[in-house]
Amino acid sequence: MFWKGPVFTRDGFQGRGLELKDCEIVDKLDGPEDGVIVPLFRNCHTHLGDTLARDAVPEGLSLSELVGPSGWKHKWLANNDVGVSIRAGMKEIITSGTGLVMDFREGGKAGLDTFDDMEYPGTLVLLGRPEKDEGLPGDNAGISSLADVGSMATDLVRQARERKGLVGIHHSENEHEDVRAVIELEPDFLVHMCHATDDDLESVKSAGISIVVCPRSNSYFGNLPPLDKMVDLGIDIGFGTDNGMLCTANMLDEIRFVRQEFDSVDLQQILSIACFGLDDMFNKD
């Protein structure tokens, strides 16, 4: 059995179809093409717990008022069934062809436990954050920002490294932050970087740190990441849909938005980020 159409790979589009039994690209097929064939997408940054808050988000709130430690989102999470909300987000992920999702999971160990009975055929990477005096839940650390957690960040990174986990940190999302402090922590990736300077990006590239950008979510607050500069520098980039209350977890929606807002970035480059995002990070020894 064959799917007919050019196959998107790390080296761009190749062949005229895909033989399904052995997943081999073929160069010659009779008849018209059915479309294009792309790998499953990677959604490299989500907050799925607030998905069902989408129709309830108040207008006019600032970033800190909406998602800060004492913001509206956390009050909503405390008064609603987060597990049901996560399932709604996972449904969007599964039905939009996403094979990997990385969720920053609020709520400490209890927050991570909401995924225990989730059925997802792809790869699920959960990055936890502690509640109150709790230690790091799970193996991976999803840090909101250095401004939020302060010196606790060092301990969270240490715990994740002891467990051979990943470390991701929100940075320069709504205003410029000192990149030197976050580089010293040696995270695997940073999220957002909307207000990063050229020097910041060059420092991140030199440090071998990856970046996940969430353009649709950022645009809600009037921000956009300097994606074109990141691409020019050859930074290892991933796309994320961020908060479910602001954006669908559908990567096709993210791709369309990026294509619309960043016309200087080649479409095949956009597809490559969507399909093979954070390749360098995942393939590190």
List the model feature ranges, each with a label.
Residues 23, 237-241, 256, 275-285:
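Structural signature of the urease/amidohydrolase superfamily beta/alpha-barrel
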Residues 60, 119-121, 185-187, 230-232, ...:
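Short, hinge-like loop/turn segments at secondary-structure boundaries
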Residues 4-10, 86-93, 210, 215-220, ...:
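C-terminal helical cap
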Residues 75-155:
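Active-site loop-helix segments enriched in His/Asp/Glu that coordinate
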Residues 134-245, 264:
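Active-site core of metal-dependent hydrolases
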Residues 12-21:
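A conserved glycine-rich beta-strand in the N-terminal activation segment of trypsin-fold
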Residues 51-84, 175, 180-185, 207-210, ...:
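Active-site gating loops and adjacent loop-to-helix segments of metal-dependent hydrolytic enzymes
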